Regions:
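Secretory pathway targeting signatures of secreted, lumenal, and periplasmic proteins
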Residues: 1-107
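Structural motif
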Residues: 7-10, 161, 184-185
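Generic structural motif
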Residues: 14, 88-92, 139, 174, ...
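Surface-exposed amphipathic alpha-helical segments
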Residues: 15, 168-213
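Signature of long, low-cysteine stretches enriched in small and polar/charged residues
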Residues: 57-157, 209-213
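Short glycine/proline-enriched loop/turn "hinge" motifs that connect secondary-structure elements
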Residues: 157-164
C-alpha cells in the first residue's frame, strides 16, 4: 500500500523559502551593487534579481509544492540559484525528455528548441532508487519581455506505489560559468530527497515504511 504522504528535501542553510522581494534578498542586492562601480555589472545584477523574482512567481503559478532559493555574495561574486518541486503525471510509454518535462511543468523554452547541451541520463538517489534526470542550459520565457538562461537539472522521483505519478525536483541557476560546481551542488541537494508518511517515517521505493526520516 502506498503510504507516502509528503516529501523531505534538505536545502543548504543559505537557501530560504521566502519571497524574493523580501528584506533579505534586498540586502543581498544592495551588497552586490555596492561591490562594483561598473554600470554594466550593476545592470547585470539588477537583471539577475528581476529574473529571480519572475522565476519564483512562475513556479508558484504552475503549482510548485516547494519554492526555495538563494542570493548570496561570495568573494568571487554573486551566486543565485532556485529549487522547486512539482507534482506531475506521466502516461506510460512517454519519453522523459526535456521538452516533455518542460511541458509537464508548464514552462517552455523561449525559442522552442531543446538545449544543445541537454543530457538525459539516470541518477541514483539513496532513498528513492534509480531515477531519470535531465540537465541542460535552458532559455526560458518568463514574461512577455523577460527571457532567462539557466543551468537546469530536472530529476523525476517516482511516487511509491504508483507507475505514473512523479515529483520533479527542478534546480536552476543563472551562474553559467560555474556549470560544474552548480551541477555538483544540485546533485548533492537532490541526493537528500525522500518520501515520508504523515508521522515522518521514511517510505522505501516499494512503498513500505522504514525508519524515521
Amino acid at each position: 500500500m502506498n503510504t507516502a504522504q509528503r516529501f523531505l528535501l534538505d536545502i543548504p542553510d543559505s537557501w530560504e523559502q521566502v519571497d524574493p522581494s523580501g528584506e533579505e534578498p534586498a540586502r543581498t542586492r544592495a551588497q552586490a551593487l555596492a561591490s562594483t562601480d561598473d554600470p554594466r555589472e550593476k545592470a547585470r545584477i539588477n537583471a539577475m534579481f528581476r529574473q529571480g523574482r519572475e522565476v519564483t512567481k512562475a513556479a508558484r503559478r504552475h503549482g510548485a509544492l516547494l519554492v526555495a532559493g538563494t542570493a548570496t555574495m561570495y568573494t568571487e561574486g554573486l551566486f543565485m540559484a532556485y529549487g522547486m518541486v512539482f507534482a506531475v503525471n506521466t502516461p506510460k510509454g512517454e519519453e522523459l525528455t526535456l521538452p516533455v518535462l518542460s511541458a509537464r511543468l508548464g514552462v517552455s523554452s523561449a525559442n522552442g528548441v531543446a538545449p544543445k547541451d541537454r543530457i538525459i541520463t539516470s541518477a541514483k538517489v539513496p532513498h528513492v532508487g534509480t531515477v531519470a534526470r535531465v540537465t541542460g542550459t535552458e532559455v526560458t520565457r518568463l514574461t512577455g519581455d523577460i527571457d532567462v538562461k539557466l543551468l537546469t537539472m530536472h530529476t523525476m522521483m517516482p511516487v511509491p506505489g504508483s507507475t505514473e505519478d512523479f515529483l520533479v525536483v527542478t534546480l536552476a541557476s543563472p551562474n553559467l560559468p560555474l556549470k560544474n560546481e552548480v551541477y555538483d551542488l544540485f546533485d548533492a541537494i537532490t541526493w537528500t530527497f525522500r518520501f515520508v508518511t504523515d508521522d515522518g517515517v521514511q517510505v522505501s521505493p516499494d512503498g513500505t515504511e522504514g525508519v524515521a526520516a
